[in-house]
Amino acid sequence: MSHRDLVPDEIADRVQLYWYFKENINIAIYGSFQQSRKRDLLALRDYLRAYGYLNARISEDYSDRLDPGTEDGPIKDTRLSDLLMDESSIHIFVFVKEHQDEHYLIQSVSMEFQRLSTLMQHGIKEDQPAAIYIEEGLEKIAGGVFKGRIAQNEHGWDIGFFKNIEQIYKPARRFCERSLARIYGF
């Protein structure tokens, strides 16, 4: 491999370009919105934004893009999820265990996870970096298809486990840094 020295102006230009990409790349965060779980996703989004990933988003961040007459409900939720996925280049999935009186927490995020995988399999979305964070213990009680998809990991996505949401902040930021470097060749 040949080595080429960068001139000072070129270094400054590359740094400026890096920050431009970092501030403008769309990062999707998927997970449950039930109870405190939505606050956790918002906290992760805000953490990434504080580190310069200004377009880290959850689906509700796209609400202003829909027709104002769109009624709240499952159709709106699906449209928002589709917008989030279709416009994002980096994807973060957060799978959590159900606590008492919580049900079907991973149903929607599992469908989003499968949708991205299918879009990639059919060449509709190019290779998309994704990180999958799983609350410890979920892997023991989840259904067989979920366990199989995680074990199979056909796209080579990052997989990590956590006890509380704060434990994924730094790994998610590092994942975004690696993904940005891969996408833009930095």
Region roles according to the model:
Residues M1-F186:
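Conserved catalytic or regulatory cores that recognize and/or transform ribose-phosphate-containing ligands
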